[in-house]
Amino acid sequence: MTIMRKSHPLLKIMNHSFIDLPTPSNISSWWNFGSLLGICLMIQILTGLFLAMHYTSDTTTAFSSVAHICRDVNYGWLIRYLHANGASMFFICLFIHVGRGIYYGSYTLRETWNIGILLLFTTMATAFVGYVLPWGQMSFWGATVITNLLSAIPYIGTTLVEWIWGGFSVDKATLTRFFAFHFILPFIITALVLVHLLFLHETGSNNPSGLNSDSDKIPFHPYYTIKDLLGIFLLLTVLMTLTLFFPDLLGDPDNFTPANPLNTPAHIKPEWYFLFAYAILRSIPNKLGGVLALILSILILAAFPLLNPSKQHGLAYRPITQTLYWIFIANILILTWIGGQPVEYPFTTIGQVSSILYFAIIIIFMPIASMIENNILKLHF
């Protein structure tokens, strides 16, 4: 008799995805972050659901409802800070996941990569609208500044901004619709994750060597389920440490002040995980140019499969491109730092140089390095 997990219509899908899935035997811990992202998404949906039970999306009561959750709801403070810091953990895992994809050449799996970019955009949109909900000073002014960027679109810009706001400024209508978006988007993300996995399992996973691993596959369970469990425990340890000991470490002090349209904070800045893109936006003096650079800073990931002339898969045996990759990572960290600094010399100049370098490494230097490496291989073999 066939084992039930191999014959039952529903269990069969689970079996092919998480149990009997043929997996390369040499994938390292960098491949753990996919499952960690799944855990982060589950934590965010669960904590968000409990927060939504007590939150009110009205400008007069939103700020006090968050205070009420922290003070009066049983373990409300824990749920709120798990949700806020869970978002930070989500983005840390997300950036490492994308970084691993670039390093090991996972962008050659085109469909999986493109759905991944769509997931990144959707997650960023979810985090942005979520940051507005506590209705603190930085929530309000962040929403005003970022949505106002759409006014740079020729002809329809101003109309589009007023349509998103639901009026002539960020107000009650904006907060209500942002809450609606923040509630629905995680479920759209979940659906996209399933499509992401569907495409991944069509081709099979990549591996650190960049070679075809069809001849050396092992079942996902128990080998990688145990490995993923270790990663999950480490993730939860970091998340709980952050939540219980340093809950406000990654937040902004301005957000402890209720939103006031008549008082602008000294430095308006988004959450830390958007700072690199915000620095690129600020480094261009033209408004429309800045908006385009902001979008391109993420959309350029879609160009990786097109800008890869290398004969090798991944960077494991490509020292020149490896060096460029780590310069690129360091550059993103510099941009993140610049995004949190005031708009004054020398920060503006550093931001402009880093922004140019960000695009130049991807569009110019990496393809050239790949061609040089191809020629070196021709000379020696």
Curated annotation (Swiss-Prot):
Cofactor(s) needed: heme b
Entry's Gene Ontology cellular component terms: mitochondrial inner membrane; respiratory chain complex III
Predominant subcellular localization, coarse grouping: mitochondrion
GO molecular function, one term: metal ion binding
Binding site for a ubiquinone: 201
Membrane protein topology class: Multi-pass membrane protein
Cell compartment(s), UniProt: Mitochondrion inner membrane
Entry note: cofactor: Binds 2 heme b groups non-covalently.
Highest taxon of the lineage: Eukaryota
Binding site for heme b b562: 83, 182
InterPro entries for the chain: Cyt_b/b6_C (IPR005798), Cyt_b/b6_C_sf (IPR036150), Cyt_b/b6_N (IPR005797), Cytb/b6-like_sf (IPR027387), Cytochrome_b (IPR030689), Cytochrome_b_C_euk/bac (IPR048260), Cytochrome_b_N_euk/bac (IPR048259), Di-haem_cyt_TM (IPR016174)
TM segment ranges: 33-53, 77-98, 113-133, 178-198, 226-246, 288-308, 320-340, 347-367
Binding site for heme b b566: 97, 196
Role of this protein: Component of the ubiquinol-cytochrome c reductase complex (complex III or cytochrome b-c1 complex) that is part of the mitochondrial respiratory chain. The b-c1 complex mediates electron transfer from ubiquinol to cytochrome c. Contributes to the generation of a proton gradient across the mitochondrial membrane that is then used for ATP synthesis.
Family, as annotated: Belongs to the cytochrome b family.
Protein's recorded name: Cytochrome b
The species this protein was found in: Kunsia tomentosus (Woolly giant rat)
Encoding gene (name): MT-CYB
